[in-house]
Regions:
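Beta1/beta-strand and adjacent pyrophosphate-binding region of the FAD-binding site
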Residues: 1-12, 27
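Short beta-strand/turn micro-motifs composed of small residues
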Residues: 8, 30, 84
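Long, amphipathic coiled-coil "stalk"/hairpin helices in large membrane-associated assemblies
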Residues: 13-18, 31
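Gly/Ala-rich phosphate-binding loop of Rossmann-like dinucleotide-binding domains
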Residues: 17, 21, 145
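Glycine-rich FAD pyrophosphate-binding loop
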Residues: 21-40
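Short beta-to-alpha linker loops that shape the active-site pocket of alpha/beta-hydrolase fold enzymes
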Residues: 32-34, 109, 142
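Dinucleotide-binding Rossmann-like beta1-alpha1 core, especially the glycine-rich loop
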Residues: 44-115, 121-123
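Helical element adjacent to the flavin cofactor pocket in flavoenzyme catalytic cores
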Residues: 126-147
């Protein structure tokens, strides 16, 4: 008999179950044959601390140190670039402000990502503090913690 049942074996469910397992008996129910089968296993696995709604940004900031340091860290530097067409200027400006992105020239954007066609975008921005998350290792560590 479990004290708590967590439904879903993706990153959110496994994370919650791992934390709860420190104090309770926890069972994770997953419909698929493997954990992380859907979005958690197929995502771009990007950690950008300032991305999302205010509630998401708060969670990102609260978890940043854990992702950097726990079990040797789960983050690898990648950087984040955004590009936008002229008609998306307002949304681009909002992202620059809320995410702390530095505006860069189209030439610099193409230098960083040579496949970009400068005729297809008007604005570009770059932020070094974007990271890849090793989601597989993170989920496996959560599973070990749950057991």
């Amino acid at each position: 008999m479990s004290d708590i049942v967590v439904i879903g074996g993706g990153i959110a469910g496994l994370s919650a179950a791992a934390r709860l397992s420190e104090h309770f008996s926890v069972t994770v129910l997953e419909r698929e044959q493997a954990t992380g089968y859907h979005a958690s296993g197929r995502s771009a696995a990007m950690f950008e601390q300032n991305y999302g709604l205010p509630s998401t940004v708060a969670l990102n900031k609260a978890s940043a140190q854990y992702h950097r340091e726990a079990n040797g860290g789960y983050l690898s530097p990648r950087g984040l670039m955004i590009i936008a067409a002229r008609e998306d200027a307002e949304a681009f400006d909002d992202d620059v402000v809320t995410m702390g992105i530095e505006r860069i020239s189209k030439d610099r954007a193409v230098e960083l990502v040579p496949i970009l066609d400068p005729a297809k975008f008007t604005f570009a921005g770059y932020h070094e503090a974007g990271y890849d998350i090793d989601t597989d290792r993170l989920m496996q560590d959560f599973i070990r913690q749950i057991r």
